[in-house]
Amino acid sequence: MTARVASGNVASGNVASGFSRTVLLGVLLLMVPLLATDKFGDVEITTFIHSSIQIEHAGKVIQVDPWSLADLSHAKPADLILITDDVGHHLDVAAIARLRKAGAPVVIAANGRPQVPDGVVMNNGDTMTFGAITVDAIGAYDIKPGEPYHPKGEANGYVISVGGKRIYVVGVTECVPEVKAVRNVDVAFFPLNLPLARMEPAAAIDCISAMAPKVVYPYHYDQEWVRPVPAGGARPTPTTRGLQELKAALTPKNIEVRLADWYPK
């Protein structure tokens, strides 16, 4: 895996010495998040924040759940946007408007229609093709009661077939039969839903083992971090609970577990 720092130019002022330039660069690097970019054949995937992902192939860009809390100055304009759910850190109208190319489809689940009136609704089980990209909508829902609750049929995961690869962005879900039945996955983005106890590590291991993707990225695993922060407050230290447990259980099954830096420190 390679890490890429996309940093802008200093807009004004002259730095007099090499030492000062070095100090200034260090400050800028502390402010700009590292963007982790992996290549799978001709497909390039960049991870941003929580559940925000960029997929590129042959000059086409897919944005999944873009969120303004990420540094979107390093995101590319999208030919296709996929939204998994209607919650603000999945469906961010401002981020969609910023990254959407003119005429680019925005795929939403039915619950996103009020916020994206011109969105393309995909129901669980639907398949659509956008140029050379095929998208299958997979059910994503909760079984255990409690809030927030995701009823069956209101949110999607997506299997994205592009560049000869099958990439499964699972969305917010428990280990339901629809998820467990997906096969032939090259790359999976699989949620933990902590601390809500709806997708604990043991359930995730069971589901991923059945799916048997070649590579899996745990994502969407810190619900405390994404909660709104009061004025003057600070976000909590990101959790890492369950990540090493997944790695220890899945690596012997020839499933590569990659840990991305989803939450800025």
Language-model region placement:
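Intrinsic disorder/low-complexity segments
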Residues: 1-29, 33
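Core dinuclear metal-dependent hydrolase active-site scaffold
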Residues: 36-76, 119-183, 259-265
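Anion (oxyanion) recognition and catalysis
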Residues: 56, 100, 251
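Active-site metal-binding motif and surrounding structural segment of the metallo-beta-lactamase
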Residues: 63, 68-114, 183-189, 212-213
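Active-site environment of divalent metal-dependent phosphoester hydrolases
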Residues: 69-72, 87-91, 113-116, 126-129, ...
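Short amphipathic alpha-helical segments and helix-helix/interface helices
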Residues: 93-100, 157, 179-180, 204-208, ...
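Binuclear metal-ion centers of metallo-dependent hydrolases, dominated by the metallo-beta-lactamase
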Residues: 120-129, 205, 209-265
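Metallo-beta-lactamase
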Residues: 159-228
